[in-house]
Amino acid sequence: RWRFICCLFLFAVAISVSAQAVKKTKMVKIETTLGTIKVRLYDETPLHRDNFLKLVEESFYNDVLFHRVIKDFMVQAGDPESKSADSTARLGSGGLGYTIPAEIKFPELYHKRGALAAARLGDMANPERASSSCQFYLVQGKCFTDQELDEVEHRLNMVLRSTVPFKYSEAQRRQYKTFGGTPHLDGQYTVFGEIVEGFDVLDKISAVETSKGDRPKEDVKIISMKVVKR
């Protein structure tokens, strides 16, 4: 009997922990002028998660533009200077006066299609790969062949110089071959979330005409962001 009661207690604890994990999962709805995207934030990157949520709660992203759009690559937003920018302004250097320490959890978190990642300055100016306080990008990417992924692995191993050579898992290869992404960015930028709804909107944004500096000819704006339950 005591064994039965103990099992019931452990089961109840497991259910409670599972429920708490689900409850803590943070989702953000991004309303844009081209539709709605919903993203899930990763608990594995708490500094980026909490910073993003703070800015969302403060309505920081309201009226911010997608100022850099490259088809088959990514769409970037979050520059506060874009809120009041005219059509000739060069954007992408704005921030909030601080950076976020890198939380690069590669290979667990990688640049698959729909990945949400933090923008940052290049390695020369930023060898620690600290992230922008507010700028982020969403990966559209493209599909890759096994040969192309082999080449990416080779380049990554040149950079990582690990005693155990890196290889993409079968699941990761399948993701990159079937759905796409930007594997050449893996291990270099912090991926802190992913799209769960609105891939069609990502594709709409990626398809807009752009001018010099990859800025859309017609503004694509974030109307609002809101934390949602699921």
Predicted regions and their residues:
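A periodicity- and composition-biased signal for non-globular, repetitive helical segments
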Residues: 7-9, 82
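Hydrophobic h-region of N-terminal signal peptides that target proteins for export
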Residues: 9-18
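Cyclophilin-like peptidyl-prolyl cis-trans isomerases
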Residues: 17-230
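Bacterial N-terminal signal peptides that target proteins for export
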Residues: 1-6
